Amino acid sequence: MITFDQLDTELQALENPNTIKIFRNHGCPDSLDLYGLKIGDLKKIIRREKLTKNHELAVELIESNNSDLIYLGLLAVNPNKVTTEQIEKWNVAFRETWSQLTFGLASIVSKRDDALLFAKKWIESEYDLTKSMGWQIYSEHINNLPEAEALLQRAKETLQSESNRTRYSMNGFIITCGIYKDDLHEKAIEAAKSVGKVHVNLGKTSCKVPDAISYIEKARNRVN
């Protein structure tokens, strides 16, 4: 079975300066080491080494100081074997880093039975990336979310006063309501109109914030 050191050596040998530059421009801080592997390459390693069956190694990767190794661990870890204490520990570790890591952590939490407890807590956080994770989790659970309408109203009323990445995730929540909740489709369109254009600092990139109304309508047209 492959070890942490062997994985670290393999990833380092695959270092990609161009991707490193892209990831730094997207917000990966200098405080984290970075080899610049693409997500597809990480997933190939997971399949080859059957890392999803090695929970302990995945945890070890997550608790490293290398963004590639951390994300590899987040992709491989068993959500139901992770403790609530570990989740909060990782939240603290990642909340002032960059969105790739918090996106990965939110994806783990979304697969757990207690996901909505974290979402409810995290949207009240003072940390932008933590709050953003809360809204991401709510979006993942949109079809099993009795409070969806109340959250949509909150997004409508407060999005523009929220911090950077939180605005992005709240905009995503409005879009999710508009696409997947027939009973909230019109209210989501109304919310998007009320909110107006959403500005988010996405780093030195050409990435743009999705326009909620056009995104909803295009997605609905594809479905229908």
UniProtKB/Swiss-Prot annotation:
Can you tell which superkingdom this protein's organism belongs to? Bacteria
Against Pfam families, the record matches this protein to: DNA_alkylation
The name this protein carries in UniProt is: Uncharacterized protein Lin0241
Q: Which organism is it from?
A: Listeria innocua serovar 6a (strain ATCC BAA-680 / CLIP 11262)
